[in-house]
Regions:
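Glycine/Thr-rich phosphate-binding loops of Rossmann-like dinucleotide-binding domains
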Residues: 28, 80-81, 102-103, 144-145
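N-terminal "arm"/small-domain region of PLP-dependent enzymes with the aminotransferase-like
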Residues: 1-46, 139
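Conserved beta-strand elements of the Class I
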Residues: 18, 71, 91-93
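Short loop-beta-helix segment that forms the pyridoxal 5′-phosphate
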Residues: 48, 60-82
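Active-site phosphate-binding strand-loop segment of PLP-dependent enzymes
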Residues: 118-163
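Conserved PLP-anchoring active-site segment centered on the Schiff-base-forming lysine
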Residues: 84-107, 112-114, 125-128
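Short, well-ordered alpha-helices that flank and scaffold nucleotide-derived cofactor binding pockets
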Residues: 35, 61, 81, 85, ...
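Generic structural marker for isolated residues within well-ordered, non-membrane alpha-helices
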Residues: 34, 56-60, 153
């Protein structure tokens, strides 16, 4: 992760009433979680498998997929960096404003990034610039909360086979 994202509340030396720097919500009753974990202490006191192959296999089986099609990560940020690494050097569009890790991961892996501030929507025109081979679209978007309808996403994908 490149500097510029994360929870920096510790820097301010005072209690912050509402912290919007992450999507972790701490103002909730955790009694149900505590009870759930208490009954599973035997299974969680061991160090986990070094790779999530068992979990990936179970997820693949549940969703009728080949196990090679499932990749369990330590969260969205790891997945973003793995995807950017896999498609290193690609012409990439990022719909803005959005989560900063998309651009950071792309810069780290040599992408040529085009920031787009409007989705292509005018009168049924769903085309992205012709040199774009990859695009990042956060849905619902972080930080705006905007939701893009499934029908629009389907049209966007169908009209941009190069991506």
């Amino acid at each position: 992760m490149i500097d510029g994202h994360g929870d920096d509340a510790y820097k301010y030396g005072q209690k912050i009433r509402i912290n919007f720097s992450s999507n972790v919500y701490n103002h909730v009753n955790h009694n149900g979680l505590r009870e759930h974990l208490y009954h599973r202490m035997e299974s969680i006191r061991s160090y986990p498998e070094p790779e999530p192959y068992t979990l990936e296999g179970r997820l693949a089986e549940k969703h009728h997929l080949p196990s090679a099609s499932v990749c369990v990560t330590n969260g969205a940020t790891e997945a973003i960096y793995l995807i950017a690494q896999t498609f290193r050097g690609t012409n990439t569009a990022i719909f803005q404003p959005t989560f900063s890790e998309y651009a950071d991961a792309c810069r780290m892996h040599g992408h040529r990034v085009a920031s787009m501030y409007k989705l292509p929507t005018a009168e049924g025109n769903y085309l992205l610039p012709p040199d774009i081979r990859m695009f990042w679209l956060c849905n619902p978007n972080n930080p705006t909360g905007a939701v893009i309808e499934k029908a629009y996403l389907k049209e966007l994908i169908e009209h941009n086979p190069q991506v």
